Regions:
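Alpha-helical repeat scaffolds in large eukaryotic proteins
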Residues: 23, 27-34, 98-101, 121, ...
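Generic signal for short, ordered secondary-structure residues
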Residues: 1, 5-8, 75, 92, ...
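Long, contiguous alpha-helical segments
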Residues: 118-129, 133-169
């Protein structure tokens, strides 16, 4: 939760990186919703960030700039070239930010999310961060906690993909 929480503090380079991370997740959601897939590398990186609750720094979550390049490019595109795809991504970003703000104001729910992520991390250590059980666990955690907050995010895309349980679970994780 540290990565999202840092966005609401005084502007810093860490805030910019955290915001790029939110954009990156939103881009991956949009790609899953419209194309039905993201690369294993992208999914693994996003899941690793999610499971790292206590990073030394925000930049350590992403490694090199290439680890957050999709998010940085998405922010740049949002400013320079508004398309329907970028409009959807921006809507997801705003929804994520809204839900993160509401979540951080609820200590009981934030503890529940933290405990759930800790359990998923243990599971990922045993399997892998992209194992279907880890993804199902985090998707269930999202459904039980974050999705109960008023102001749900409506993901739009190809119904063929969005109706597939494995893709819906990945969307909830991201």
């Amino acid at each position: 939760m540290e990565c999202i929480c840092v966005i609401f503090r005084r502007p810093t380079a860490d805030q910019a990186l955290a915001l790029a991370g939110v954009f990156q997740s939103a881009e991956l959601v949009a790609k899953l919703a419209t194309e039905g897939h993201v690369s294993e590398e992208q999914l693994s990186a996003a899941m690793s960030v999610l499971l790292n609750q206590n990073p030394e720094t925000v930049s350590s979550l992403y490694g090199t700039v290439s680890g957050i390049e999709l998010g940085i490019n998405s922010m740049r595109e949002m400013i320079n070239d508004r398309t329907q795809a970028s409009t959807d991504v921006m809507r997801y970003v705003i929804g994520i930010m809204y839900l993160a703000r509401r979540l951080t104001a609820d200590p009981v729910r934030i503890k529940q999310v933290g405990d759930g992520i800790t359990n998923a991390k243990r599971q990922a250590d045993h399997f892998s961060v992209t194992h279907e059980n880890v993804i199902a666990n985090i998707a269930g955690l999202y459904t039980d906690t974050v999705s109960t907050i008023k102001g749900r995010i409506q993901v739009t895309g190809n119904a063929f993909y969005l109706e597939q349980p494995a893709i819906a679970q990945r969307v909830r994780c991201l």
